[in-house]
Each structure stands twice: as C-alpha cells, then as structure tokens.
C-alpha cells in the first residue's frame, strides 16, 4: 500500500554556492558522514556538487512523502542516500521508527537534480 509520494528538484549551482560559502559546516549540517565520504569518488567540485544536489533532493522528497517536513523528529543529516552495488539508489533514516519501504529514483541534467520517491508498506 502506498503511503506517500514525494518529488523535489534542486538547482545544482545553488548547492555549489552554499558549499563554497559555508564549507564543511554546510556539508555536516545537511549530509550524513556516509554521503560526505561517498562524494570522494568524484574528483571535481562539479561532480561533488551533483552528488550532493541529488542527495539534497532525495531528503526533501522523502519528508514530502512522509508529509512531515523537517523538524525536531528528523534532520537532514539523519537521512542517508546511497547506491547499491548495482547502482540502485536507496535511502535510510537514523533514529527512526518509520517502517516504510522506499522506491527512490535520482537524476540530474545540466543545472538540475531531481528525486522521486514512493513510500509503501509491505502487505
């Protein structure tokens, strides 16, 4: 049973500008340690910015699907987006008792990154 659908689009240069302006403080506030570490596979700032923009969009899409937004119960850095060995994007949430499965799709082109997520309960 589907319990929520979320979508978000991010302007990649915005993420790059925030990163340049606030540095690691921005990264640590928004992204998990795993996401920051995973960005090291990219050698260019632009590649890293695409990586972070897709994960930013995934976090926003996730809380939209939940219908809660960010707040006391969930912070951006509590959410981790990663890829399986086969490249499929996955999402996990620390300190959460939410028991939904997530189907996540990420994409980027030119200056934009997008995330689409479906949350569902297993029958």
UniProtKB/Swiss-Prot annotation:
<keyword id="KW-0479">Metal-binding</keyword>
<dbReference type="GO" id="GO:0019878">
    <property type="term" value="P:lysine biosynthetic process via aminoadipic acid"/>
</dbReference>
<dbReference type="GO" id="GO:0008897">
    <property type="term" value="F:holo-[acyl-carrier-protein] synthase activity"/>
</dbReference>
<keyword id="KW-0276">Fatty acid metabolism</keyword>
<dbReference type="GO" id="GO:0006633">
    <property type="term" value="P:fatty acid biosynthetic process"/>
</dbReference>
<dbReference type="GO" id="GO:0005829">
    <property type="term" value="C:cytosol"/>
</dbReference>
<dbReference type="InterPro" id="IPR037143">
    <property type="entry name" value="4-PPantetheinyl_Trfase_dom_sf"/>
</dbReference>
<keyword id="KW-0444">Lipid biosynthesis</keyword>
<keyword id="KW-0275">Fatty acid biosynthesis</keyword>
<dbReference type="InterPro" id="IPR002582">
    <property type="entry name" value="ACPS"/>
</dbReference>
<feature type="binding site">
    <location>
        <position position="8"/>
    </location>
    <ligand>
        <name>Mg(2+)</name>
    </ligand>
</feature>
<keyword id="KW-0443">Lipid metabolism</keyword>
<dbReference type="InterPro" id="IPR050559">
    <property type="entry name" value="P-Pant_transferase_sf"/>
</dbReference>
<protein>
    <recommendedName>
        <fullName>Holo-[acyl-carrier-protein] synthase</fullName>
        <ecNumber>2.7.8.7</ecNumber>
    </recommendedName>
</protein>
<keyword id="KW-0963">Cytoplasm</keyword>
<keyword id="KW-0808">Transferase</keyword>
<comment type="similarity">
    <text>Belongs to the P-Pant transferase superfamily. AcpS family.</text>
</comment>
<feature type="binding site">
    <location>
        <position position="60"/>
    </location>
    <ligand>
        <name>Mg(2+)</name>
    </ligand>
</feature>
<dbReference type="InterPro" id="IPR004568">
    <property type="entry name" value="Ppantetheine-prot_Trfase_dom"/>
</dbReference>
<dbReference type="InterPro" id="IPR008278">
    <property type="entry name" value="4-PPantetheinyl_Trfase_dom"/>
</dbReference>
<comment type="function">
    <text>Transfers the 4'-phosphopantetheine moiety from coenzyme A to a Ser of acyl-carrier-protein.</text>
</comment>
<dbReference type="GO" id="GO:0000287">
    <property type="term" value="F:magnesium ion binding"/>
</dbReference>
<keyword id="KW-0460">Magnesium</keyword>
<dbReference type="Pfam" id="PF01648">
    <property type="entry name" value="ACPS"/>
</dbReference>
